[in-house]
Every structure is written in C-alpha cells, then in structure tokens.
C-alpha cells in the first residue's frame, strides 16, 4: 500500500509545476474551448482534472491502509477507495485509448504522464486484488462510490 499510495501522490504533486510551466491541453473537438495559460491559474486548476482526482483518491486511501494495522470499517472510506480504484482505471483506459498522442516535452511531464496514466492505473487495482481486505465492496458502498465521479462530471 505504501508504494501504491506514494506514486499517485507524487503524480499529483508533480502536476503543479507542470501547470506552472505549460498551458492547458485543449484537445480539438471535445466540446470545450479556452483553458488556462501556464502559471498559477493552471497550477491551481490541476485538482479539477479527472486524472488528478482519481490519483488523489488512490493515494489517500492507499496511504490510510498502509498506516493502519486494521482496515477502516466505514462505508465512506470504502466508497472513496472504490471510487478511486474505478476512476484510476477509467483514467488509464480513456487517456491511453483516446487522448494519448499529445507532446510531452520535458522529463517531468513524461514522468508524470507515465505515472498517472500507465503505472497507477495498473498498480492500484493489482494492489487492491492482492492486499485489500475482502468483502469491502458492497452494493451500498458501490452506490456511494458512484457519487464522486458523477459529481466531477456534473
């Protein structure tokens, strides 16, 4: 859990200097225009990205599991864990199948891209399958978990 928590945290943290140095990527034909120029506004907008959100959810829940001897029992924790796992898998699939191909022109950008769009979407579900306590995804928790990505999409 330590590694599967630390890597998405590093990915989220390295997003901020990328936002300071690069304009928003606005992909043609996706239905929106504008974006943020490089600088504080783009850096502070990083948490609005689905990639950032999904990696932050995985980081927070993985580090919580790593810090505790026994797994949390609350519906809220396991709903957030489930939302993070599902969201980071969606991030990996959508980015690599649809959005990949944009130029990553710095080492930090390439590192961040690989971490958040390839490594974490594979590592998080693998760690979940190997180490998470069984029986934590219930219909109630799955329903609660769906609220997070739906709120992001709204």
Regions found by a protein language model. Give the residues of each.
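Interfacial segments of alpha-helical transmembrane regions
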Residues: 72-87, 136-147
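Alpha-helical transmembrane segments of multi-pass membrane proteins
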Residues: 7-29
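Alpha-helical transmembrane segments in multipass membrane proteins, preferentially the mid-helix core
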Residues: 121-137
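Non-cytosolic membrane-interface motifs at loop->transmembrane helix junctions
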Residues: 76-79, 104-116, 139-141
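Juxtamembrane "helix-exit" motif on the non-cytosolic side of transmembrane helices
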Residues: 96-105
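Interfacial helix-start motif at the membrane-water boundary
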Residues: 38-56
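Perimembrane loop-to-helix junctions flanking transmembrane segments
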Residues: 26-44
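Aromatic-anchored segments of alpha-helical transmembrane domains
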Residues: 8-16, 88-97, 148-154
